[in-house]
Amino acid sequence: NLNPGSNTIKFEGYGSGFFKLSGKKIKTPILIFPDRYIAIKSNKKNNIKNEIINYSNEYKIDLIIYGNPLGLESSKDLITKELNSLNIPLEIMNTDAACRTWTVLVSEGRCVCAFIKPQR
């Protein structure tokens, strides 16, 4: 668990093709942790997996959220397989639900990470 505070990353907005975090509009997929985020320029699954492993060496991650426009339809894609291999609980949902779920869980002080692709 982390203490929710002013430095916790929260969504300020999201919509078709973008996220707004910390006053910045981001148009790429993001990997987000309670205290930082990374704009992912391409879907290099090894980079995503390695970043999560590095973070989990620092903090015990309660949950990984995978948000994408296809929701559960993406449950057989390569990213899902890589995330499942980490042996951390994984929830797959559509992008909007992932943004809302992220906001609720970090406000509760939960240590979650999420890989979220913008809606099209």
Regions found by a protein language model. Name each.
Residues T95-V106:
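Long, charge-dense
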Residues N50-E51, D77, D96:
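Generic alpha-helical secondary structure signal
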Residues Y55-I92:
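Mid-chain, well-packed structural core segment of small domains
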Residues L70-E73, A97-C99, R120:
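A short acidic, glycine/proline-enriched capping/turn motif at secondary-structure boundaries
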Residues I40-K41, L72-S75, T101:
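Short active-site-adjacent helix-start/loop capping segments
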